[in-house]
């Protein structure tokens, strides 16, 4: 995750007045580039402790079941590529994890949502890959929050729009089967989000062909380009 760059203050004389050069150069918050929060799913080590699926909920889910075989590594690799593309386009980027382990806060999906919330993300991109006992299953799908008063009602319209735009771009970039959009009410990372949030299942790790593609850097760049283009459609640069 790129850190804020320090600015060396200089002084400029103008009509007998000293002005801070840095103050002249710094963009106002209104013109700052949108921040995209990339959330590579899972960790190398599962975390089976429980957390509420939404604020005040009596329903609990495990924080991290580990995902499909190899998923955590693949989505991190794609996340790095996506970060490069977005930074090159002029976006600001934050990543929930840049190593094998997510260590922010109390970990889990509440912490992932809070990480993006506190940075005021224009979009939270949750990167995942699918798994199935049926090894013939393949394709890309994008999940978005279901409506729930007090949880997702404020982010649902924008999240659904982002899901549609990103799904179309990833399918076009990869040629993968289009499995469409999926509305989910039970995902902790959605229910605690205060910013538009979507989850992209970038393919099936359990399909021999698709799983092999997802592990290959060339295909990962295709996925990342689709994600970047869809993000650009949803959050144009000022």
Q: Where does each model-flagged region fall?
A:
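Active-site-adjacent substrate-binding region
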Residues: 155-186
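Bacterial N-terminal signal peptides
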Residues: 15-27
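Mature extracellular/periplasmic domains of secretome proteins
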Residues: 108-122, 187-192
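Active-site-adjacent mobile loop/cap segments within catalytic or ligand-binding domains
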Residues: 47, 126-134, 143, 178-238
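Active-site histidine-acidic residue metal-binding/catalytic motifs
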Residues: 33-113, 146
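Soluble non-cytosolic domains of exported or imported proteins
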Residues: 69-77, 103-110, 153-161, 214-225
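Sec-exported extracytoplasmic/periplasmic mature domains
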Residues: 80-92, 98, 117-121, 129, ...
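Sec/Tat signal peptide C-region and signal peptidase I cleavage site
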Residues: 28-32
């Amino acid at each position: 995750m790129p850190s804020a760059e320090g600015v060396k203050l200089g002084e400029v004389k103008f009509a007998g007045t000293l002005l801070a050069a840095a103050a002249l150069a710094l963009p106002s918050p209104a013109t700052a580039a949108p921040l995209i929060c990339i959330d590579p799913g899972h960790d190398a080590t599962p975390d089976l402790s429980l957390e509420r699926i939404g604020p005040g909920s009596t329903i609990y889910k495990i924080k991290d079941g580990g995902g499909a075989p190899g998923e955590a590594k693949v989505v991190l690799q794609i996340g790095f590529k996506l970060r490069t593309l977005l930074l090159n386009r002029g976006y600001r980027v934050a990543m929930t994890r840049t190593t094998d382990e997510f260590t922010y806060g109390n970990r889990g999906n509440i912490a992932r949502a809070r990480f993006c919330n506190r940075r005021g993300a224009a979009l939270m991109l949750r990167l995942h890959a699918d798994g199935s006992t049926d090894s013939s299953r393949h394709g890309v799908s994008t999940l978005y929050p279901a409506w729930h008063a007090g949880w997702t009602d404020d982010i649902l319209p924008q999240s659904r729009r982002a899901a549609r735009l990103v799904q179309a771009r990833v399918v076009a970039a990869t040629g993968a089967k289009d499995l469409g959009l999926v509305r989910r009410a039970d995902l902790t990372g959605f229910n605690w989000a205060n910013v538009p949030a979507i989850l992209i299942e970038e393919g099936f790790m359990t399909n021999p062909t698709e799983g092999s593609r997802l592990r290959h850097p060339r295909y990962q760049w295709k996925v990342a380009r689709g994600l970047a283009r869809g993000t650009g459609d949803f959050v144009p640069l000022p």
